[in-house]
Amino acid sequence: MSQGAGAEKRTRFKSGNRNVFFILIGFIAVITVVQMLFIRPGSFPTMISPSNLMNILIQVSATGIMAMGMTMVMIAGGIDLSVGMLTSFVALYTAKSFIDWNYPLAVAIIAAILLAVLFESAMGWIISRLKVEPFIITLGGMTCFRGVALLIVNSQEVSMQGALNGLKNSIIPPVKDPAGLIINVPPYIFVFIAITVIVWWVLKYTKYGRRIYAVGANPQAAYLAGINVKNVILSTYALNGLIVGIGAICLLARVNTAIISTGQNREIDVIAAAVIGGIAMSGGKGNAWGVFLGAILMGAIENGMNILRLKAEWQFVAKGLIIIGAVVAAAVAANLQNRRQLMAQQTKTKQEGAGDAQVDH
């Protein structure tokens, strides 16, 4: 991919980020109006209360962290269906090693994260070296991680007994917002923001980030340009393991108890956040801030549906429709862009032909 093409795509990323942002603001505004008119008329709408907005960020932080790892994997042209069960494994292994095996907390956390990196690296090696479809390998990984996690804890849940409360407890004194709700600001929110900034910086400003885009856009062209495509793909899965491990620890801090369902179906939310945030399923396109907004939008939709007292089943319907809508919208936008480029190229060719004819005359 040429530098000009890369710059053009990055310009479209910014436009895509604005679109997600405006959809987020529009959704919050609609829920707020409905709440003011029909649910709680005459009172401050909880949807826009500082406490509720912070709760949305709290709810999506772990998913958003994991989505940053998925961002790099998908930009490089891959996908990972195993992140949900890998999350359960990391949570269960951490809790089991700390509570039952008496590991120091730091050792338990580091060991669990390193295992996540190892497992993801193994899948990345198979995908990059043996040319196996990521969908198949990560689907197998999902099943394998589930089985290993169940074996470790014998299908039981394990409580952390508040050992991770330092990541969960609010860093500010109790303060009530206009809706009378207490504002909670746990530290793992800042972990989410910090990882987003790091991934954004790596993708935007480093040679490694440019290689990820190049591999995702056209692996063959990247190879001919001297990029080690296999190592780039392998490294994105290894980094994904690291980031998923961190996200799993943050999630464990929030829920306190590790169980096999801790990460169940988490991959749906992670992939949805990435796709809504502008990551192309075909690779080579997207950025971290778009995914950041996509994760928050997913959380806002779930939160808004709870405020409207809709059944939880409708949340799955909404998530599925959102993913389908995001993919269709991206495909339509890409087709329109390709058509405009083709028309511009044809116009340029005609103008050059007319100029050559005048010179000959």
Task: Describe these PLM feature segments.
Residues 29-36, 49-101, 126-132, 274, ...:
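Single transmembrane alpha-helix segments in multi-pass membrane proteins
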Residues 26-45, 76, 152, 200-207:
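Structural signal for alpha-helical transmembrane segments and their membrane-water exit/capping regions
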Residues 244, 254-320:
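Transmembrane alpha-helical segments in multi-pass inner-membrane proteins
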Residues 102-143, 293:
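Alpha-helical transmembrane segments within multi-pass membrane transporters and channels
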Residues 103-109, 118-123, 127, 175-258:
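Helix-loop-helix "hairpin" substructures at the membrane interface of multi-pass membrane proteins
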Residues 134-208, 232-235, 255-260, 341-361:
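Transmembrane helix-bundle core of multi-pass membrane transporters
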Residues 21-36, 70, 113, 146-147, ...:
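Hydrophobic core segments of alpha-helical transmembrane domains in multi-pass membrane transport
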Residues 1-33, 37, 217, 224-231, ...:
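Cytosolic-side transmembrane-helix boundaries in multi-pass membrane proteins
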